[in-house]
């Protein structure tokens, strides 16, 4: 088990290339199972979750080839014969549950384990299953598995997502594009990952109206073609590095190969901190402010403030001159990182789904432990401005979602080293 050893404080200067998005790639991989013949996805990051999903897909009999040097992933579903996603793989990552929509969507039946994934908060799959039942798909739960069986013909159906859910939207789109006569999904998520999935399926031959809106109307087609599609850049990685650049007054970095249009309201909030942010096509240039201004945020569905940048923002606010509040309206239980920041010297009080942050406080080194993917990166950000040497333990969470994190940060001046945790835990 590895840990990061980070020496701070250090300014960041230079250029960081943004990787492809894990959250956008996983639905595209599931969509590839719906086509006839091999579909190729480019700009795919080399991440643990991608490898896990490759293995989930291989269990079905599909052929998966990942050319890591070119970041190209080719999936050929033509030899699928095993309509199951087993517990030992699905438990590692909740997005494996997209196999339910993909398999029942193309083959009319599936057996998929209930998912695992990040440790925080309840993540019910009731919305996914409720939408499928609304389509007339027979759903049963036995011994930790979901069994799905589609009828010979799915007629007209509609379903309203309450609340809106990215995962459920993706699964229901996958399930309906080949099966449904007409399926209307109300209060659908319109995150960039959902839009890219729908646009990709449309290019494969699916009939989807309302892409990019909260109402999707899907008319089933007989078959889908295979295509080559480029995966989106990672907007959460983009936001994370923007925050990292703002936290040390001498930092100035350029992020390349991103898509600023997919960041929603985030740049607007970011500029309020006093940081200088210049957008030039697919590049973003950030210059840190001399003093960070406190800016309170409430997370929201896209284009609102992303819940996946909440922990990083809270960390930046420990260095802001004044009081701010970070409220997560998406998940109740996403502040498990706060006690670790407090160990570094942060002044943060959590009440229900809000954190009240007082700054600026000088952070100093300690050993801290990651609890989930975004929490772990917030501890890395804190360690880079903390005085002394900080150990960040359990960084396997980071390997699920950040490609080459220590190499990218080292290349712009961070003192960060991956070492074997050994007896440290």
Q: Where are the language model's segments positioned?
A:
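Short, structured segments at the rim of ligand-binding sites
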Residues: 1-425
């Amino acid at each position: 088990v590895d840990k990061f050893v980070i020496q701070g404080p250090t300014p960041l200067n230079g250029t960081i290339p943004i990787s492809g998005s894990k959250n956008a790639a996983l639905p595209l991989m599931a969509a590839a199972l719906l086509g006839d013949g091999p579909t190729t996805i480019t700009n795919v990051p080399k991440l643990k979750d991608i490898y896990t999903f490759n293995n989930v897909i291989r269990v079905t009999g599909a052929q998966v080839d990942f050319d890591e040097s070119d970041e190209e992933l080719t999936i050929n579903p033509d030899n699928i014969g095993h309509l199951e996603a087993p517990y030992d793989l699905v438990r590692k990552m909740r997005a494996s549950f997209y196999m339910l929509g993909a398999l029942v969507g193309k083959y009319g039946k599936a057996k998929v384990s209930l998912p695992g994934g990040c440790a925080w908060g309840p993540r019910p799959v009731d919305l996914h299953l409720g939408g499928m039942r609304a389509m007339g798909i027979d759903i049963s739960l036995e011994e930790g598995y979901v069994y799905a069986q589609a009828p010979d013909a799915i007629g007209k159906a509609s379903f309203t997502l309450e609340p809106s859910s990215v995962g459920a939207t993706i699964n229901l789109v996958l399930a309906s594009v080949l099966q449904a006569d007409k399926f209307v999904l109300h209060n659908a998520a319109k995150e960039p990952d959902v839009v890219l999935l729908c646009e990709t399926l449309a290019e494969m031959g699916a009939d989807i109206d309302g892409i990019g809106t909260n109402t999707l109307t899907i008319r089933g087609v007989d078959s889908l073609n295979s295509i080559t599609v480029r995966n989106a850049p990672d907007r959460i990685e983009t936001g994370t590095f923007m925050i990292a650049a703002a936290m040390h007054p001498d930092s100035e970095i350029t992020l390349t190969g991103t898509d600023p249009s997919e960041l929603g309201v985030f740049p607007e909030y970011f500029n309020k901190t006093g940081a200088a942010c210049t957008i030039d096509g697919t590049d973003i240039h950030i210059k840190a402010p001399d003093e960070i201004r406190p800016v309170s945020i409430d997370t929201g569905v896209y284009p609102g403030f992303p819940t996946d940048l909440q922990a990083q923002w809270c960390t930046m606010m420990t260095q802001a001159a004044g009081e701010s509040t970070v409220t997560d309206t998406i998940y109740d239980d996403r502040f498990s990182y706060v006690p670790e920041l407090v160990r570094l010297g942060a002044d943060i009080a959590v009440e229900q789904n809000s954190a009240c942050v007082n700054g600026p406080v000088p952070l100093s080194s300690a050993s801290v432990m990651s609890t989930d993917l975004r929490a772990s990166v917030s501890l890395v950000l804190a360690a880079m401005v903390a005085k002394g040497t900080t150990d960040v333990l359990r960084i396997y969470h980071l390997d699920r979602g950040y490609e080459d994190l220590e190499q990218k940060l080292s290349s712009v001046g961070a003192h960060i080293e991956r070492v074997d945790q050994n007896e440290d835990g």
